Amino acid sequence: MIARSLKHWTGRNLLAGSETGAPAAFAAKIFRAPFVLIAHGTQADPILNYGNAAALALWEMSWEELTRTPSRLTAEAPNREERARLLAAVTANGFIDDYSGIRISKTGRRFRIAQATVWNLLDERGNYSGQAALFSRWEFI
């Protein structure tokens, strides 16, 4: 769903040349990819439901911790209003591909992400199923 939705909104593949073949092999490549990929669901307070190895390392969480975390907690309280505006814009427009902002890890380590693509996730029927973000540029601050 993540790769298909990215292609739907942006016309780009998640991993060029890797989206054919066995789904398990594709999932393993994405999990080990050198970029951060993270997603949340559709709950009133959306819970993270996917993070690849780079996301787990950046947010300093285990899979179990990540998939119990409300996505709003990836930003510090003063930055949550700005984050909410971003997600509302993505909901309205389908995606953005130039997001920059400050995030915070589980241990309180702050980092700035740059040139992130954030997009709506759609199921096979085109129903809204959450949002995902992809970025490969960040710096600790």
Model-identified regions with their sequence ranges:
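Terminal domain-start segments
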Residues: 1-27
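Sensory/regulatory domains in signal-transduction proteins
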Residues: 25, 31-141
